[in-house]
């Protein structure tokens, strides 16, 4: 599931330590020499201390739950077992003893619980002692030492908090900023990459590439037998660079060459279709242009309806099934396209900067047309923000299965060594007050258990179970974030499915073609409206 995050750059704030440890650090600024006389990679102890202190401080201050510097450092030291599996740490009172098959036992005095610099100094001292004793530690690159410690520190927090090495952090920044590519989607065939979509206005489009063209070579390398990811890597590159491709255009048998200048590619995240006056907007993820893509697709679709039927559209389906999420701002902007006012989402965490309220302040571009949102078990994060906002404000009927329940925000902390920590620091709170994480959004019409039935029966079953639905909504809003088992039990009322069930669309189309039926189902949202007051 995609992470929703904001970026934060740390500024080193390291107070140096008492004289005894200071001497050890200054002496360690040169490469340590082992008993064998071999010199390791240069270990800048001052820089390492700054990096560990910065990491421990920001995790402790910003993580969504309280966590001390001592917990982080001790778990980080245990993370060194990925380098030295025999490592043993014995903790007694204010001292720890560390030893392994290759390290003689050594005892250390522990700093105060939240003395970030003290724990950073201790971590560095232990690493220096290990390097001075064992060639294995000397041979281990500094990046691997950082990774082992921070992976250990973060391992007991949550699944979305993680450390990225200097190189991985660089790739992450490039990914967040966009990438250099040619602007196509493709599938792999026996003879190369078959183009399935050319993005309008992209380098590929400008160069004359068309759907169904087959790219057989990129920069002289055959694409035959390559995996899709390998082919994608060849087509991507630095913005402004040139990729030379060889193209086969069936039914021709002789390929031709194209030189395509890579540019920043922003993936198209919304497409549309129109059927019998019903507009279907399919959103695949939330990137920097998703709200713009949704607005453009809806405008085009409404024009198509007017041309085809010479009248007004019956309604809009917003298909968020299997959408893993993306950017928080874009989730807010997409919600705002269909709302006139009111709260869209709130974020709540321990750190003051993590608390935000996002409100609608636009106009409804669908002009009040009936709206249905489709979700499934792979609809997560930003998708859940949109579904919850439109449901809570009684703007849409939600159909499908319970969503994934990825309701946290991650902040990205850049460390002094240029690595990154992605850290969970707040939770999403829906307009009606419940927290999404570990729970998700509950649909008004659950299609999970009746996927082999017809749309009319599923709708009637939902209306017949209106009282049960109200009870579920009440439980959804009263369950605590600490009650993990109860939250999981509630999710099982409408079990999540990862499939794109055709019946979801059939139910939506039936509702949008019958205004009275749509209003009857929409009345199920009143249970939420009552709780939200």
List PLM regions with ranges.
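PDZ domains, with a preference for the canonical peptide-binding region formed by the helix
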Residues: 205, 211-246, 330, 406-412
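PDZ/PDZ-like domain segments forming the peptide/carboxylate-binding groove
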Residues: 45, 62, 96, 108-121, ...
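N-terminal secretory signal peptides that target proteins for export/translocation
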Residues: 1-12
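Short flexible coil/turn linkers enriched for glycine and charged/polar residues
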Residues: 176-180, 188-192, 209-210, 237-241, ...
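C-terminal "post-core" interaction segments
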Residues: 5, 30-36, 42-56, 266-533
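Structured segments of extracytoplasmic/periplasmic soluble domains
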Residues: 58-66, 75, 79-86, 125-137, ...
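Terminal targeting/pro-maturation regions of precursor/exported proteins
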Residues: 12-161, 477-533
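PDZ-domain C-terminal substructure recognizer with occasional recognition of PDZ-binding tails
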Residues: 191-194, 216, 230-271, 424-425
